[in-house]
Amino acid sequence: MKRILLMVLRNLFFVPYGWFKLCWYASHVDRYTEEERYRLLQYVDHRAIRGGNLKIDAHGLENIPKENGFMFFPNHQGLFDVLAIIQVCPVPFSVVAKKELSDVPFLKHVFACMKAFSMDREDIKQSMQVILKVIKEVKQGRNYLIFAEGTRSKDGNHPQEFKSGSFKAATKSQCPIVPVALIDSYKAFDTGSIKKLTVQVHFLKPMYYEEYKDMKTTEIAAEVKRRIEETIQRNIEK
């Protein structure tokens, strides 16, 4: 990953300090408020993004609910997705990530700071326990992000099927569902290029409980995907 190396080289003097502080916060999460941990992540993220020839172009920030206790559902393009959203989202959120990412350097510390949940897709019982915990925390006012595709798309800006089960936490907690359209996020780490790159993050209008309460989760999944796909097609560079 040439761009990650570029991020490190351009932040050579910052890396020891930033890495130590990130590890410290990740190991002592209960000493800091969620707001404090999130602002640290944004600061470290900003340094990495600037060093990596990246720019995040955010749209629809006004669509993020004013009250906490909502869920983001973005399309999934790659390892940079969460970092792109962290950089431009003004309010803290946590993540439900697949178990494999808990061993990825840097990301595992980011997720620790966010008090994220790791889900083992092969273990139904563990997955259900995670969903129940997310429901409880969303009802208590925490915000979460789930990638409804389950795994990143291998087709760039073309999302895969959105899995209906990913929306159970939202429907059970009756929270606002915020679709998020990511454009060109996969190019950050997955193409081998270090050219200047703009990643687009579009926060779409939320679906509130009154809108989806009579819909099946399969219908919700299809509608969220449709809105994201339409946004990508309107904004993608031909």
Show which residues each predicted segment covers.
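Short acidic-hydrophobic, aromatic-tinged amphipathic segments that line or gate anion-handling sites
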Residues: A58, F117-D120, Y209
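Amphipathic coiled-coil/heptad-repeat helices and related helical stalk/stem segments
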Residues: D57, G78, D103, S127-I131, ...
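Catalytic core of membrane glycerolipid acyltransferases/transacylases, capturing the structured
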Residues: K21-Y25, R37, G51-G52, K66-I124
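Non-catalytic C-terminal accessory region of glycerolipid acyltransferases
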Residues: I4, M128-K238
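Residue-level "edge-of-site" marker
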Residues: L61-E62, I124, I183
